[in-house]
Amino acid sequence: ENKVIGVEALIRWQHPRHGFLSPAIFLPIFEANNRMNDLTDWIINEACIQLRDWQQEEIFPKRVAINIPGPYLTSNRLMDVLKSATKKYGIPPKAIELEITETSFVKTISGAEKAVNEFCKEGFSVALDDFGTGVSSLSYLKRIPVMTLKIDKSFVDDVPASTKDASIIKSVVQLGKSLNMEVVVEGVETEEQVQFLIEHCYAPYIQ
């Protein structure tokens, strides 16, 4: 069934003097000035506003995914911001999905595990983004209670031409589904890739 079940909040900057700026240009500036948490707070609020507007227009995507910087994941402030924004705009926590990467866990696996458990208790969904690009992915799946597995686009770029990539992505999708996770394959851009995933990979969600 072809339908939109969710969206991802991505930030772009239309600068009045320099025109369109990609995140690769301006995010390092935020990071260098320790403002990534502030930017993330703004994105969370804007996402909730957009969800509220869609609800009023009877447009109902299942959820909106928001990328969370690694160092911010274990901050008490993040939970406060999420609860405040969802309450203010009347958004159910289950409509917010927090996307985290393996780098979020590198320095503090126990802290990340605790934080993710707390988010889940409050009703927020958590997704592991760019799965397969790190060396410890499987150990993270064992400890971190993520609900969604997002497979990195590098595994689908050469599918179906590459039999090796095809075998890998099929196995990873099967792994996620066997763990009762929703599986999303990122970077799907061609009809051939869509058909391959439907016919050979248990029909995961695509992005």
Descriptions of predicted regions:
Residues 1, 16-18, 57, 118, ...:
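Flexible loop/coil segments at beta-strand boundaries within sensory signal-transduction domains
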Residues 1-28, 47, 149:
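A short, well-structured catalytic beta-strand-centered motif of the EAL phosphodiesterase domain
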Residues 3-8, 35-111, 187:
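Catalytic core of bacterial c-di-GMP phosphodiesterases, primarily the EAL and HD-GYP domains
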Residues 6, 83-159, 173-207:
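The catalytic core of metal-dependent phosphodiesterases that act on cyclic dinucleotides
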Residues 22, 77-79, 111-112, 137, ...:
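Residues at alpha-helix caps and immediate loop-helix transition turns in enzyme cores, especially N-
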Residues 24-28, 37, 117, 157:
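Conserved long alpha-helical elements within nucleotide-processing catalytic cores of c-di-GMP signaling
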Residues 30-34, 106, 158-164:
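Short, contiguous acidic/charged loop-to-helix segments that flank catalytic cores in large enzymes
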Residues 39-42, 165-171:
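Conserved acetyl-CoA-binding loop-helix of GNAT-fold acetyltransferases
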